[in-house]
């Protein structure tokens, strides 16, 4: 029987928290659900996680890569691994275009 992986600890960047507060309650619920899935399994299929192009992360823990994940058809959030091992830093969230512009 495979060992169950521990969930990642979450680190929230200021811009993530500011943009999260601007979302409608239903949008916040979608982000909440997606973040829970990410914490438990960053490869969860519905998150459609992929690397952001031409963006460097702040933390070397994850190889300086930044990732984009889907919370819904129109909502995205960005993250990277770090700042410490076993942590995920949530960088930004919101509607598709603005979120990916301000990675």
Question: In which residue ranges do the predicted regions lie?
Answer:
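Arg/Lys-rich, positively charged N-terminal/basic patches that mediate binding to nucleic acids
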Residues: 1-36
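Context-gated lysine
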Residues: 4, 24, 33, 51, ...
């Amino acid at each position: 029987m495979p060992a169950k992986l521990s969930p990642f600890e979450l680190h929230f960047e200021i811009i993530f928290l500011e943009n999260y507060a601007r979302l409608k309650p239903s949008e916040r619920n979608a982000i909440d659900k997606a973040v829970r899935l990410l914490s438990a399994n960053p490869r969860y299929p519905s998150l459609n996680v992929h690397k952001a192009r031409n963006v460097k992360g702040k933390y070397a823990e994850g190889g300086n890569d930044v990732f984009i994940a889907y919370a819904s058809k129109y909502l995205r959030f960005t993250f990277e691994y770090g700042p410490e091992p076993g942590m995920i830093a949530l960088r930004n969230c919101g509607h598709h275009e603005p979120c990916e512009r301000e990675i």
